[in-house]
């Protein structure tokens, strides 16, 4: 490969394009399964809370890689829609904790099903070995980006 070609790598462009198309498809799949109240970005927050509920916003920010200001805006919308509550920590009122509502817990099974379907579309003809290798490369890219922040 020539030096000129190496300077014009398309990894970032391809990742952005994949994100855009995946987001559009996932939004449609959520709608098709009656989950139109939740968009993929909000699903990312709910998914993190399904893994560990009743956690401080700071921890949720770390898990989702969303800034606190972006997360706060999204949490307000999710709270207004009845998916979660935000309350001060009993031991330290400076800490705001996020807790899932029954409504969001009831969505979990359907949301996970749609996520699995999206994963099947996403990886299509990949072998397990290719998926493992690909995800390893993505983790390295993510680590590189986090280190440079």
Listing of model-derived features with the role each one plays in the protein:
Residues 7, 11, 41-42, 103, ...:
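N-terminal positioning helix adjacent to the helix-turn-helix/winged-helix DNA-binding module
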Residues 24-70:
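N-terminal helix-turn-helix DNA-binding core of bacterial DNA-binding proteins
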């Amino acid at each position: 490969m020539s030096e000129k070609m190496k300077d014009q790598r398309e990894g970032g462009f391809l990742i952005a394009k994949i994100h855009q198309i995946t987001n559009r498809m996932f939004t449609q799949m959520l709608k098709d399964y009656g989950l139109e109240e939740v968009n993929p970005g909000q699903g990312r927050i709910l998914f993190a809370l399904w893994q560990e509920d009743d956690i401080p916003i700071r921890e949720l920010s770390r898990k989702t890689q969303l800034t606190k200001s972006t997360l706060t805006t999204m949490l307000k919308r999710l709270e207004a829609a009845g998916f979660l509550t935000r309350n001060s920590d009993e031991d330290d009122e400076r800490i705001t904790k996020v807790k899932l509502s029954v409504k969001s817990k009831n969505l979990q099974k359907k949301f996970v099903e749609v996520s699995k379907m999206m994963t099947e579309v996403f990886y299509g003809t990949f072998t397990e070995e290719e998926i493992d290798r690909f995800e390893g490369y993505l983790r390295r890219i993510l680590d590189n980006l986090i280190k440079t922040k």
